[in-house]
Curated annotation (Swiss-Prot):
The lineage of its organism: Eukaryota, Viridiplantae, Streptophyta, Embryophyta, Tracheophyta. This is Very-long-chain aldehyde decarbonylase GL1-8. It comes from Oryza sativa subsp. japonica (Rice). It is a multi-pass membrane protein. GO terms for molecular function: aldehyde oxygenase (deformylating) activity; C-4 methylsterol oxidase activity; iron ion binding. One of its GO terms (cellular component) is endoplasmic reticulum membrane. Keywords: Endoplasmic reticulum, Lyase, Membrane, NADP, Transmembrane, Transmembrane helix. Belongs to the sterol desaturase family. It is found in: Endoplasmic reticulum membrane.
């Protein structure tokens, strides 16, 4: 109850001092940037400093210059593409029912809507991502994202502007359909950013979510997608693995994992 009261007080401060447009556009952008860079920078530093190397999925590492190139382009993309899109999308979300007033939605509403967003996003993302691995779309659009065959957290949003628009639809489809409270939208965005950063981190730790959450892909699952030739990579899902399992696009990954496990047990 105290936590809920604290959230309500903090939210009241925000809606008193800022307009809904400011919160939904600039506030959303600043929250995204904060969560993205704060969660993405650690894996960059781990790789650069050689920390936690026993948990690194690939032995290869990106050079500091190659890492810096990613960061500079990300800032450019975010300011020139993401920020204008966030500002321009406010009217659309408002039309679809976005609100920011008190009271905040009950936690059961937040949880159920966010779960729906994850499931819907995963379904749309799978087919969109799979389409991006067709020859023409890969060569002209998706190859930008795959410039980093050894991913680290920040590479999760390193992509061609057309891909940002194309796959970004999967992320906003759920909120656009339900017209959620801005608070719910922020919870969804934070969790989705943390998920994609972890999936691109390049590290699999004992505490990684995939060790505890059924059907969750995680870093190992997506790292394979980056290091294999684009026509054979599979593993197209964003968060969960059931779509790849249903359509057989994870078969090569599972074979590789089985062989790696066999080799590992040989040396025990």
């Amino acid at each position: 109850m105290m936590a809920a009261a604290g959230l309500e007080s903090a939210w009241e401060y925000l809606i008193t001092h800022f307009s809904e447009f400011q919160l939904a556009s600039i506030g959303t952008f600043l929250l995204h940037e904060s969560v993205f860079f704060l969660s993405g920078l650690p894996s960059l530093l781990f790789e650069r400093l050689g920390l936690f190397s026993k948990y690194k999925i690939q032995k290869k590492s990106n050079t500091p210059d190659y890492q810096n190139r990613c960061v500079v382009r990300l800032v450019l993309y975010h300011v020139c593409v993401n920020l204008p899109l966030t500002i321009l999308s406010y009217r659309t979300f408002k039309f679809m029912g976005l609100r920011s007033t008190l009271p905040l939605p009950h936690w059961t509403v937040v949880v159920s809507q966010v779960l729906f967003f994850f499931v819907l996003e995963d379904f749309i993302f799978y087919w969109g991502h799979r389409a991006l691995h067709t020859k023409w779309l890969y060569q002209h659009v998706h190859s930008v994202h795959h410039e980093y065959a050894t991913p680290f957290g920040l590479t999760s949003e390193y992509a061609h502007p057309a891909e940002i628009l194309f796959l970004g639809f999967a992320t906003v489809a759920g909120p656009a359909l339900t017209g959620p409270h801005l608070f719910t939208l922020w919870v969804w965005m934070v969790l989705r950013v943390l998920e994609t950063v972890e999936a691109h981190s390049g590290y699999h730790f004992p505490w990684s979510p995939s060790n505890f959450l059924p059907l969750y892909g995680g870093a190992e699952f997506h790292d394979y997608h980056h290091r294999v030739l684009y026509t054979k990579s599979g593993n197209y899902s964003s968060t969960f693995i059931y779509m790849d399992w249903l359509f057989g696009t994870d078969k090569d990954y599972r074979k590789t994992k089985a062989l790696e496990e066999k080799e590992r047990t040989k040396h025990l």
